[in-house]
Amino acid sequence: MSRNSGRIGMGIVVGSLAAVGAAVAQREIMRRAGTRLIDWEAVRQIARRRLGEDAVPIPAAQRQQADAFYRETLLRIEPAVAEEIGAQLPRALEVPAVIDRLEWVDLNLATFQQLFARVEEILAQAQSGPDSPGRALSRIVNRSIGNQQLGFLMAFLARKVLGQYDVSLLAAGPATRGRLNFVEQNIVASAAALRVPLDEFRTFIALHEATHAFEFEAYPWLRDHFARLVSESVEQFATDSGGLLGRLRDALAAGPGAKGHWLERIMSPEQLGSFRRTQALMSVLEGYSNHVMHAAGERLLPGFAQLHERFERRNERRGAVERAIMRITGLDLKMEQYLAGERFVKAVIAERDRGFLNRVWESADRLPTLEEIADPARWVARIEGDEH
């Protein structure tokens, strides 16, 4: 055998081994890639690492004491809120849940996971042609980036959220109940930062979340309507991933001085319509809740006005990093909802009365649009016109 033929033989062997190795590597890439957009356990671990010492559980004695306080407080809050809203609950508010920061992460990741499952299903159906190692590798890279981003966001919010009425949108139905969650460690820390008595601050937060519970429990059609809006938005975004990327590039190229919020600029007209309907509903919910909270709070807490002022002043003093995160994630839109919705509620009550305002809860077509929230007289005229 010549030296060249020996080299060729060795080359064939090496090439064969390389081919086998490449095939195994491709299968491993395909296996690891799966079809998931997010690795939920990885997100949880990322959030936990970022929380660090803040991820410690609540001591059992503190949890028990806080749980008893919220139960008793909600019994006092319920009749006061019912009187202000002008509606009775068909059944009592759910038992409150005192949770720690990591428990809050777990609860919200469960909701995200259900939403993403539908997105993954739509994307899998839309994929043309067989899967390939290139596509699989792309999914792995994108999933890793998504894991980091979502883990960061969950850790950030887990330190900020005080109370949350979990409306159970993804299990909407006549028998579905919401859940009142209180992130006790954040409530204790905020009360200390504001230098207010802990029990007063607990009552303040419980009152705000209870008003949201009233809105959904007293008017059950709201949950189904809200769930449809969320489902509609998820379907639209999932079926338009290519167009979304193009609009995102355009939005980034336009820079920070462009008109409107960056989230709105990356939406198609159809997506923007659903988004604006959701924003309008959220605005009314927040504005109405704040109005009721103020009215009931004055009776339940002697120092309510001062406590509310301190709380709002602290919110206005957010640092540059926090403001940037809120803008990037769209959370700043939620803060705008509070203000616009409350102005709408006050204007309608001033022009008519609370009974007239409560017509927003009669059906979905009675809800105001964003344009009507900005100009309450338009909504008043439309509702009165419907009656003639």
Regions found by a protein language model. Name each.
Residues 73-185:
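Auxiliary, metal-adjacent structural segments of Zn-dependent hydrolase domains
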Residues 147, 151-165, 215-301:
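Post-HExxH zinc-binding segment in Zn-dependent metallohydrolases
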Residues 187-205:
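Short pre-active-site segment immediately N-terminal to the catalytic Zn-binding motif
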Residues 201-220, 345:
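Active-site recognition of the HExxH zinc-binding catalytic motif
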Residues 5-28:
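Hydrophobic alpha-helical topogenic segments used for membrane insertion/localization
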